[in-house]
Amino acid sequence: MFQIDLNCDLGESFGAYKIGLDQDILEYVTSANIACGFHAGDPSVMRKTVALAAERGVKMGAHPGLPDLLGFGRRNMAISPEEAYDLVVYQIGALSGFLKAEGLHMQHVKPHGALYNMAAVDQKLSDAIAKAVYKVDPGLILFGLAESELVKAGERIGLQTANEVFADRTYQSDGTLTPRSQPDALIESDDAAVTQVIKMVKEGAVKSQQGHDVSLKADTVCIHGDGAHALTFAQKIRKQLKAAGIEVTAISEQRST
């Protein structure tokens, strides 16, 4: 039987500003990537998101981003590997505190936005991020773009890794995501998202914007919590995965059996 983890970026509200339908989406995902205050989120939002996920048995991970609230962490910054290491250690620590306060454990770490995309193609940056995760807790699972430099860095240092694919993003022929600056970067159709996910899970391939089948490994599927169709996508993808005979379960549970 095919198995897949379904994850979502959550806890991205800030102060009086509400982003996403976290409580509803948590009914359909198996892993939650929780913002740690740099690109989004704040201490109160983090605490509340941890509680919501725990109530539903959803596994949790840190979602560290660049220090860019205005740009939601989606703008590139010129940072050194040492700075990346510090940013990731700091943000893992922030979420870890809230989890420990409730007797809970962290499952994974997934960088956010520009940090994620930069690390996908930059070996030095990805090595620094993987080192940060490993030094904090070598038992954590590192999420990264499927078969990217970040996944390779995690494997080199001895971390468990998860090759991540996206339900709501289009791909280029080199396996990278289409930049958000391009008009065709986002998938808006429920049917298109479902078709892409099932193809990635069952066939290990995705149709690129250039019309080519690109091979990739799918361990976990991401739905962006701030997307306009996030809840609908989560509902339909979960339903259609089941119909296709694909078991949806948290990545850590897959690997403990």
UniProtKB/Swiss-Prot annotation:
It catalyses: 5-oxo-L-proline + ATP + 2 H2O = L-glutamate + ADP + phosphate + H(+). It comes from the Bacteria. The keyword Methyltransferase does not apply. Pfam families: LamB_YcsF. One of its GO terms (biological process) is carbohydrate metabolic process. Keywords: ATP-binding, Hydrolase, Nucleotide-binding. CDD domains: LamB_YcsF_like. The keyword Cell inner membrane does not apply. GO terms for molecular function: 5-oxoprolinase (ATP-hydrolyzing) activity; ATP binding. Disruption phenotype: Deletion mutant grows less well than wild type on minimal medium with ammonium as nitrogen source and cannot grow on 5-oxoproline. Mutant lacks 5-oxoprolinase activity and accumulates 5-oxo-L-proline. Catalyzes the cleavage of 5-oxoproline to form L-glutamate coupled to the hydrolysis of ATP to ADP and inorganic phosphate. Belongs to the LamB/PxpA family. Forms a complex composed of PxpA, PxpB and PxpC. This is 5-oxoprolinase subunit A. It comes from Bacillus subtilis (strain 168).
